[in-house]
Amino acid sequence: MFPEKFLWGVAQSGFQFEMGDKLRRNIDTNTDWWHWVRDKTNIEKGLVSGDLPEEGINNYELYEKDHEIARKLGLNAYRIGIEWSRIFPWPTTFIDVDYSYNESYNLIEDVKITKDTLEELDEIANKREVAYYRSVINSLRSKGFKVIVNLNHFTLPYWLHDPIEARERALTNKRNGWVNPRTVIEFAKYAAYIAYKFGDIVDMWSTFNEPMVVVELGYLAPYSGFPPGVLNPEAAKLAILHMINAHALAYRQIKKFDTEKADKDSKEPAEVGIIYNNIGVAYPKDPNDSKDVKAAENDNFFHSGLFFEAIHKGKLNIEFDGETFIDAPYLKGNDWIGVNYYTREVVTYQEPMFPSIPLITFKGVQGYGYACRPGTLSKDDRPVSDIGWELYPEGMYDSIVEAHKYGVPVYVTENGIADSKDILRPYYIASHIKMTEKAFEDGYEVKGYFHWALTDNFEWALGFRMRFGLYEVNLITKERIPREKSVSIFREIVANNGVTKKIEEELLRG
């Protein structure tokens, strides 16, 4: 069982949940993903579903209802995202700031953002959206929820990233997202402004959600359905470095401009972390084959170690080989790690795929982890979800243990399953929380568990087909319909601060 102050919550993002109002007053056309999912070429090639986010669940108008549903589940925490493109639908690039540049490694060591800068930003910010997000956060706080605010969940403002043009011009356009160092500077401005406007009601911040997904699927997997859909390892390297750099700058800006405790029991006014997936959950196909073992080690370092060594130790693996590090103390700064866990990876060795990224000597094995056929059994005879992800709860334990190596508090910030018929979800929830308990009992403290998700939502390139919600959503009426078995199981676990013997006997034994 978990302690009394353990955080039980749900997680959501902006783009996936907000849109769907009948009159289309609250759509956000100023984001790269808005343009990406409706691109004719993407739809014709089957890279995206053709579903459109403006047909979505309308959390923008129905947030009070969703908060009340969460309260009745017994939850005490809620993770939300703020959409950069809603706050700044227009460019902030003309607002000048001084910055120091490390010419040896093309990284920005510091950005000088002042109160005058914030006042300039305030003049062009969308006040309606600032007021909206304050209303959302205050709604949560009034119901007793601890709020985590995440600043970036895959999307970028369209004025920074035109993914169609980036693809067609092979990233030579100016609006080329994380390949461009100006995105780093603009992110620092955005983070400073959000801390300035919301610091009085927020104490827990995350800079990014799963930054390596943006990099790997956008620049190394052109058929993934993620923008900009190019194969360019040099661009991938730049994007990784720039997102590490952006985290570090945002960390310092949030600390600088959020100086007020929102909650009396908070450790400090601003606890700034990062939400991350695939932490230490790559396993060798053959544990007795030294090459497969090394492939798994490289996979784990590429997906999490590369980022974490930089932001926790100030050590940057500039050659992307897992061995050659430079001292970059200006990149150091992170207060907590959010573990997002869904399934494992099983990998085998292959010769380096890209000469400029020596770490990529791993190849996923079909039939395990993320690489399964939906609705079947994996090669390990484990159930597989609607999205084709194997149920492997042991990976939750391993991911928590790996995250603990960096000496900061750990939270489970996403965990869930695409299961439209609610057949596998009850077992999934119970088994993964049980593994979280096991980690806690073994001395690896976990401070919270956030389920993905309260409701069905827009699953990026896959649209509305993948149903992750504890509550089904009718996309016509927007009605929230409980998936009774899972809702009951989760409510009972939350009420008892852990998996009860009754649930264990019903779902986890035999």
From Swiss-Prot:
<feature type="active site" description="Proton donor">
    <location>
        <position position="210"/>
    </location>
</feature>
<dbReference type="GO" id="GO:0004565">
    <property type="term" value="F:beta-galactosidase activity"/>
</dbReference>
<keyword id="KW-0326">Glycosidase</keyword>
<dbReference type="InterPro" id="IPR001360">
    <property type="entry name" value="Glyco_hydro_1"/>
</dbReference>
<comment type="similarity">
    <text>Belongs to the glycosyl hydrolase 1 family.</text>
</comment>
<feature type="active site" description="Nucleophile">
    <location>
        <position position="414"/>
    </location>
</feature>
<dbReference type="GO" id="GO:0005975">
    <property type="term" value="P:carbohydrate metabolic process"/>
</dbReference>
<dbReference type="InterPro" id="IPR053427">
    <property type="entry name" value="Beta-galactosidase"/>
</dbReference>
<dbReference type="GO" id="GO:0008422">
    <property type="term" value="F:beta-glucosidase activity"/>
</dbReference>
<dbReference type="Pfam" id="PF00232">
    <property type="entry name" value="Glyco_hydro_1"/>
</dbReference>
<dbReference type="InterPro" id="IPR018120">
    <property type="entry name" value="Glyco_hydro_1_AS"/>
</dbReference>
<protein>
    <recommendedName>
        <fullName>Beta-galactosidase</fullName>
        <ecNumber>3.2.1.23</ecNumber>
    </recommendedName>
</protein>
<dbReference type="InterPro" id="IPR017853">
    <property type="entry name" value="Glycoside_hydrolase_SF"/>
</dbReference>
<dbReference type="InterPro" id="IPR033132">
    <property type="entry name" value="Glyco_hydro_1_N_CS"/>
</dbReference>
<keyword id="KW-0378">Hydrolase</keyword>
